[in-house]
């Protein structure tokens, strides 16, 4: 059975249980519902001025939303739909953003120390320092994505 068929069965079950889904009742495809959830959630995120001021580019929140929307895993689909219906999706995404950014800050310091990236190195060999910092940041960001976005 294809994931689309499984998702439609799940949606049919939810409708059968009289779960509030009025806004999706005219939609036929699961993908259409997922895209609508994504669109509405991004709109709500943009309206949260405090959050947007703190994170003008909420990369990890948006990546997490995209991950849940595009996931082939039935558990992720259920999680997305339940959080949306319970109105906890936006808070979940904001928390993912906070956790990922905090993780990056902590790990960056640890990894800089472990790799010997010091102010002295920055002054004496700026090109080497910059290259190593670029690699370090790419690694830390990949770690954050694995730990928080794809968890």
Residue ranges and their predicted role:
Residues 38, 92, 147-150:
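Aromatic-enriched hydrophobic runs in primary sequence
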Residues 1-79:
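Oxidative protein folding and maturation machinery
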Residues 33-48, 97-104, 133-137:
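Short amphipathic alpha-helical coiled-coil/interface segments
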Residues 85-122, 139:
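Active-site helix-to-loop segments that bind/position phosphate- or nucleotide-bearing substrates
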Residues 58, 62-74, 110-151:
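C-terminal charged interaction modules
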């Amino acid at each position: 059975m294809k994931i689309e068929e499984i998702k439609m069965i799940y949606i049919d079950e939810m409708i059968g249980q009289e779960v509030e889904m009025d806004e999706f009742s005219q939609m036929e495809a699961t993908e259409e519902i997922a895209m609508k959830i994504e669109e509405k959630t991004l709109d709500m995120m943009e309206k949260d001025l405090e959050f947007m001021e703190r994170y003008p580019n909420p990369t990890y929140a948006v990546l997490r939303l995209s991950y849940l929307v595009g996931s082939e895993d039935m558990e992720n689909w259920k999680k997305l739909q339940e959080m949306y219906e319970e109105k906890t999706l936006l808070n979940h995404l904001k928390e993912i953003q906070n956790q990922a950014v905090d993780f990056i800050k902590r790990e960056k310091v640890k990894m800089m120390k472990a790799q010997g990236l010091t102010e002295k190195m920055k002054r004496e060999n700026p090109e080497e320092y910059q290259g190593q910092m670029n690699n370090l940041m790419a690694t830390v960001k990949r770690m954050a994505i694995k730990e928080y976005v794809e968890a």
